Amino acid sequence: MLKLLLGDPNTRKLKRYQPIVEEINFLEEEISQLTDDELRKETQNLKSTISAELDLKKQKELLEEFLPKAFAIVREASKRVLDMRHFDVQLIGGIVLNECQIAEMKTGEGKTLVATLPCYLNALTGKGVHVVTVNDYLARRDAEWMGQVHRFLGLSVGLIQQDMNPLERKKNYDCDITYATNSELGFDYLRDNMATDINEVVQRKFNYCVIDEVDSILIDEARTPLIISGQVERPQEKYQKAAELSLELLKAKELSKDGIDPEGDYEVDEKQRSCILTDQGFAKCEEYLGVSDLYNPQDPWAHYITNALKAKELFIKDVNYIIKNEEAVIVDEFTGRVMPGRRWSDGQHQAIEAKESLKIQPETQTLASITYQNFFLLYPGLAGMTGTAKTEEVEFEKTYKLESTVIPTNQTRKRQDWSDQVFKTEIGKWKAVAKETAQIHREGRPVLVGTTSVEKSELLSSLLSEEKIPHNLLNAKPENVEREAEIVAQAGRAGAVTIATNMAGRGTDIILGGNSDYMARLKLKEILVPLLVKPDNEHKPPIPKQRSSKSKGGFSKKAVTNLKKNISNSSTSLFPCKLDEAFEKKLSVLSDELVKSWGDRQLSVLELDDRIATAAEKAPTDDNSIKLLRESLSDVKKEYEKVLIHEEEKVREAGGLHVIGTERHESRRVDNQLRGRAGRQGDLGSTRFFLSLDDNLLRIFGGDRVANLMNAFRVDEDMPIESGMLTRSLESAQKKVETYYYDIRKQVFEYDEVMNNQRKAVYGERLRVLKGIDLKRQVIGYGERTMIEIVDAYINPDLPPEEWNIDQLISKVKEFIYLLDDLKSDDINLLSIEELKNYLQEQLRIAYDLKESQIEKIRPGLMREAERFFILQQIDNLWREHLQSMDSLRESVGLRGYGQKDPLIEYKNEGYDMFLEMMTNMRRNVIYSMFMFQPKTDVNEKN
């Protein structure tokens, strides 16, 4: 009723933005008359005015005042540099982002271009802007592509990549606009707060941040905290023994009910991702290991056995991890990408290494951690973009205080979403997927098939090979990751078939007919790598090969069952046409010129990529080599476009891109992301999901109803099932999972909120010390607090002064401050408690000045260095121990629910007490260390 009376709030909001859009449009003609240099001058004038205002409220008002002009400048720069003009709906998206909201824009509506508007405006404050993407590839692409606009206008653009050293990171963070992944930003923040010198700190104070694919980062990845670990020695033979034992144990066929153990040695709860030993299993393990108690603190085994069982049942090779260079490398469940350097904690990674007979790496201990929720809440200005935010609107608002606004599409959507096809068995489903893929391919339409794991993508690849359907595989396998740019460039070509693992998280648009710009870059890279790249750095882009199949039609039993076979990729010809001899000759001349300028095989692959990317820009350059490269790129692109424009028309006429989903995701939002790959910007397209009753979602969360359905449907595996009850079960299962994971994220957030307040206090103290701000006053403050604590511990105000334990008090003071060796009870016997505290504090200050004069004689400035060293040492050591204690507390506090106590409140109260104790110990240890500090002097100095 309220909605009917007041209208849709989203529509009301969009109407409010309309006058601003009209003002930007009004300024367009005026701004278009300016020369390139005048545009840059306008930027400098705006930056000088806005950055000079130190009052935050007034600065915000200035940003609002200059928004129309700033957006008009960016629009004009984009037209000149990218040949792309912001539509009115994209301007609305920019306004929404500037107001620190989430802009929901459908796939292909130009989210990446929209981000240039608020990023430019907020960069004018001079405080820096971060643009966050889900992976290195997208960060690099956006910095190269959209960075052209900002560089053209005179702003500096930085990029953070995984392999950068601290100096490179600092330089890039100091830029006006910096592109980075969420994990790189988070880990740099943690590393900065472990730095021992202010020069090691790479990040500036946070200002404004735009997150691309915001739901992927703030929702999907919010269950996993960022952790920096240090190594801890643990007995490796226990992991090996537990792995051997796990193979001897039998899995129970069902979970226990009403306290009765099922038959078997252990139960697997896939929903909770846990393995639990039965009574029979406990007995079997104790007998096998020759021990009487698996939980014996002197010789614990339970933790190792549980991890070994989880490695056996829940961590699957080529799904959760792959083996690369004799190491188990994690595969990101949301993006399908490998995450080298990341390891599971609590001994789980070691259990997987034992299972796969790999070298077992030392176990780790947490040194620093933070959740994505609390990390991104550190930004005063936070905004995000996604194609699907409304399904998680409540969580965005509750956790992050972020409103969501749906931005209208520029063109009407023409995509058709075909009804789901559900099969009784997984094999039936995969056969149907292969059949529909082959059919659409023969119609001349491109097909994108989304799979959930490396294993499944390779099964489908083998089925398509038997049908002689050429296709590309894009998954976490290293040989496929290297070809990502090539695969995406041609995924929209006529009849192209692309199998992608978790494509929904990749954030890459597929252009109908193929991407001529990418293809031109790849062509030049293919020619230049052998001539310009150092031999040890050489990674030539693989030349696509057509793979033949010995099979003659149909599906062999081998193809269906061989899920884990490592399959080579097939591909259509990458380049749309062969360049003629004159063209090849021209490219040969270019190669010779570049070798003269840049040296024979002197560059790394990344350096060559950078130069090709710079050449692809339209920004002005004085580098003749870049000019030559730019000219050649443009010529190759035009040649390819001549062919691809006809191919684009052909694909449009055939019906556009067809997207196939092979499993419902845990979240409806991710299903919608995958669907959104088709029908971008008003293109034609279609989508369909193929499901089976064996799929994880239905099997784990569907409950007994789905199990009964499986028995009820007496149909062939090749026959699709259509049932209203089944559709409802599917929707119900997805809602259950969304609620289940929301509760987990909420719990992670609530528990980390306790740690977050402590983290802020510790990191704030640490930063003051690193900057060397009032170090002496800080240490004296620690000492004064310690004197008060000693008096409170040894003097009981309820007792008369003659009964006070003055001797023990003096003894304790001397433990901390040996320079007060001549302190006697006669000096303080007649003092009141307050006078006693003041007297001891005064004596501490005198002793500290005396200590300082001794140390400074050895070398001026040494006392300040010692203060910084000891404070940082104590903070780091005690914080590390505190993190371990808090982890243990969190694990144990859950059991208090059985005693009618709220575990979270218990965690907050005990955690707070533990934190106060840690800070007290830190102060006392620093004071003790400072007075005991006796630097070694050079023998020659003494003489």
Curated annotation (Swiss-Prot):
Pfam families (alphabetical): P-loop_SecA, SecA_DEAD, SecA_PP_bind, SecA_SW
Reactions listed under catalytic activity: ATP + H2O + cellular proteinSide 1 = ADP + phosphate + cellular proteinSide 2
Matching PROSITE patterns: SECA (PS01312), SECA_MOTOR_DEAD (PS51196)
EC numbers, comma separated: 7.4.2.8
Top-level taxonomic group: Bacteria
An example Gene Ontology molecular-function term: ATP binding
Region span, Disordered: 537-556
Subcellular location(s) per record: Cell inner membrane; Cellular thylakoid membrane; Cytoplasm
SUPFAM superfamilies assigned to the protein according to its UniProt record, in alphabetical order: Helical scaffold and wing domains of SecA, P-loop containing nucleoside triphosphate hydrolases, Pre-protein crosslinking domain of SecA
Entries under Gene3D superfamilies matching the protein: Helical scaffold and wing domains of SecA (1.10.3060.10), P-loop containing nucleotide triphosphate hydrolases (3.40.50.300), SecA, preprotein cross-linking domain (3.90.1440.10)
Signal peptide residue numbers: none
Keywords noted in UniProt: ATP-binding, Cell inner membrane, Cell membrane, Cytoplasm, Membrane, Nucleotide-binding, Protein transport, Thylakoid, Translocase, Translocation, Transport
InterPro entries: Helicase_ATP-bd, P-loop_NTPase, SecA, SecA_CS, SecA_DEAD, SecA_motor_DEAD, SecA_preprotein_X-link_dom, SecA_SF2_C
Membrane topology field: Peripheral membrane protein
Binding locations of ATP: Q90, G108, E109, G110, K111, T112, D509
A biological process term (GO) from this entry: protein import
Cellular-component GO terms for this entry: cell envelope Sec protein transport complex; cytosol; plasma membrane-derived thylakoid membrane
NCBIfam families: secA
Similarity comment: family membership: Belongs to the SecA family.
Quaternary assembly: Monomer and homodimer. Part of the essential Sec protein translocation apparatus which comprises SecA, SecYEG and auxiliary proteins SecDF. Other proteins may also be involved.
Function: Part of the Sec protein translocase complex. Interacts with the SecYEG preprotein conducting channel. Has a central role in coupling the hydrolysis of ATP to the transfer of proteins into and across the cell membrane, serving as an ATP-driven molecular motor driving the stepwise translocation of polypeptide chains across the membrane.
Name recorded for this polypeptide: Protein translocase subunit SecA
Organism ancestry: Bacteria, Bacillati, Cyanobacteriota, Cyanophyceae, Synechococcales
Protein's gene: secA
